[in-house]
Amino acid sequence: MEGFWVSWLGLPGLRSHPRLFLTGMMDGPRSDVGRWGGNPLQPPTTPSPEPEPEPDRRFRRGGGRSFWARCCGCCSCRNVADDDWGPEPSDSRGRGSSSGTRRPGSRGSDSRQPVSRGSGVNAAGDGTIREGMLVVTGVDLLSSRSDQNRQEHHTDEYEYDELIVRRGQPFRMLLLLSRTYESSDRITLELLIGNNPEVGKGTHVIIPVGKGGSGGWKAQVTKASGQTLNLRVHTSPNAIIGKFQFTVRTQSDAGEFQLPFDPRNEIYILFNPWCPEDIVYVDHEDWRQEYVLNESGRIYYGTEAQIGERTWNYGQFDHGVLDACLYILDRRGMPYGGRGDPVSVSRVISAMVNSLDDNGVLIGNWSGDYSRGTNPSAWVGSVEILLSYLRTGYSVPYGQCWVFAGVTTTVLRCLGLATRTVTNFNSAHDTDTSLTMDIYFDENMKPLEHLNHDSVWNFHVWNDCWMKRPDLPSGFDGWQVVDATPQETSSGIFCCGPCSVESIKNGLVYMKYDTPFIFAEVNSDKVYWQRQDDGSFKIVYVEEKAIGTLIVTKAIGSNMREDITYLYKHPEGSDAERKAVETAAAHGSKPNVYANRGSAEDVAMQVEAQDAVMGQDLMVSVMLTNHSSSRRTVKLHLYLSVTFYTGVTGTIFKETKKEVELAPGASDRVTMPVAYKEYRPHLVDQGAMLLNVSGHVKESGQVLAKQHTFRLRTPDLSLTLLGAAVVGQECEVQIVFKNPLPVTLTNVVFRLEGSGLQRPKILNVGDIGGNETVTLRQTFVPVRPGPRQLIASLDSPQLSQVHGVIQVDVAPAPGDRGFFSDAGDDSHLGETIPMASRGGA
């Protein structure tokens, strides 16, 4: 039956995705709200062969909508796209005008584009130019980064020659005419996007000069001087974003003329956080500078007690990145009519940054085996990833949460959405929609791993983007969570958000999109269940402050860390916070979980781990305090295992048991030393370990349970700039690294990247001996002036998560030429560094 529908609807490629098709056709409103039972994480997939591009149909005008388009309301929607995009579309590379490829040699230089000239066509279509006809002999879109357009629209940093503007804001252009402009002449500007532009969908925009257009579009003559016409063009604050074809029509007594399409006259239109009429408007200039224009940022990882930070090169203005971002929308087959809606666009991006369902940008891999790609810890920015996807059409291996989030920040900032990268420490992954983290133990309080499907990630990274939510009741505008890491499905697709942070804070899990899942990540409780003699399970302990313990992002205007936990949840333990948790849990799969709470506690337990560098011995300890007026006997059991940052644990490699006698009001500490040789064979990514502590108080029957995650720190790379940095002039940087391990690091790879400084560069340095120090020197040529950041990383099978950064203040070139012409040089990708040039010490 499924095959019949596929054939009848004429949907190529749908046969291989019957589940997605049936989900889109049959899922009810419940699936629109959140992730009510999805697929588990899938293993890394092999990229599919690059599909052959279809013939270019961008100039097609006529024709009706297809049967599928007539059935699907989202294909003609102007402002709000459907949240279910149905089956995976066929590849649309090379078909539309929203992404496309750039002409050879276009590297974002600051030279002004020559005006376009063409014979044009008259009304008869025979190319004859009659005497007296008003012919457009050239167009100057004033697209140079030094021109007023790019400066006023805050797009002067994009390494592109074409005009890039933000919607809802006027721009200027010049028309060169064959004769003097007369009041009886009529001039019409036209913008077209997509394969089948239609006025009703907003994909064919007609702007009569001197008259008001529809939806906020208009054009005015500001100056007429001889055969030159100065125009001021106003775009709609609700305009579709993308790359538009541009043409001009004229009409006079002598006939009509149309300027031919010219790739040099294509216009990019983006969202506009500076425009009050745009629903992405941000009313703080310092926010816009940070969340739209900043090309680098900090991403936080590790554990709450041992926070690590790394600098990430977003590179949203680098040559080719804007085309890659628009290609992502094309590849998903997103209807052009929905591309003016940031809710729909951000939801598509959350689906397309991961490769599941739709062969998106990044392949997720949490296995620890990255031999067929790049270790997620080795990436230093988004540029290399996005350009690879644009160039090949293949999903890029591999990513984990911070990589997905870093790429998402790049894409959304590039398209004009104020976006930041957010880290949640002790982030829950609720698999059964109970909105609680359920941990099961046997009669002796040993974890039952086969039942523990819920997990708590040491940290999880996602994105906040700023927009109004006209699809929700009032009060839910502002920051919206978008999460591109594929964890659970939403409406049958691996995507998440946008979800109002305000709805998360108050436990309003019925608000779309995906609020139940995100609420559980930040504000669920840990519920400990113990197996009884009859095989049933009983709640023995509820840990209320274990999830979402710290939520942070980079501070505005500095590299400091900003605590934004208060935006996501009320103060822990407050009446408002408890009400939010219980409201959310009432909508989950275990609504009565709080009906039977445990007895009072009089013995407190605190778990600690020594802050150690990888390669050192360490110590873990448990502090017990008796708050009662009677003696207490505590039987304690400690289990130590390694853990992935996702909460997936390895086998227990060390444990100890202890019985402690506590006098009234007394405290005692239980310690367990751990040697490097004990944990070395078991280490996995991030160097994290999980200490499970369980026990009970003999006299009162109180159950003690605690899970404590900690990590081993890795060293940083030391970067030093050798000399001044000037646009267009070679500069040198020194990188120093000391191996902290007593073992040899093999197949060591360095990565170097920085927007405006260095295109992504890979350096293969071979082996580094145990405790050896190496020094590398690398040259680069800055291409843009101003404060920049050069970022480096090191990766090897024995050690990862090693990185460093240096601030580089680049002076303008003599004569202030702006962009240097070699902005897109990729010639150093994959360089092998000879041993003699490493400067080993």
What are the roles of these predicted feature ranges?
Residues 28-29, 381-518:
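Hydrophobic/aromatic-rich core segments of domains that either
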Residues 652-681, 759-783:
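Intrinsically disordered, low-complexity Pro/Gly/Ser/Thr-rich segments with frequent PxxP/GP/PP motifs
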Residues 276-422, 426, 430:
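Secondary-structure boundary elements
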Residues 237-245, 678-690, 784-791:
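Short glycine/proline/serine/threonine-rich loop/turn segments at secondary-structure transition edges
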Residues 253-299, 699-729, 801-826, 830-831:
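Short beta-strand elements
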Residues 179, 183-186, 190-295:
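Extended acidic/polar, glycine-enriched regions
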Residues 184, 630-634, 742-747:
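Short acidic/proline- and small/hydrophobic-mixed sequence motifs that coincide with surface turns
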Residues 145-191, 228, 612-624, 633, ...:
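Contiguous beta-strand segments within globular domains
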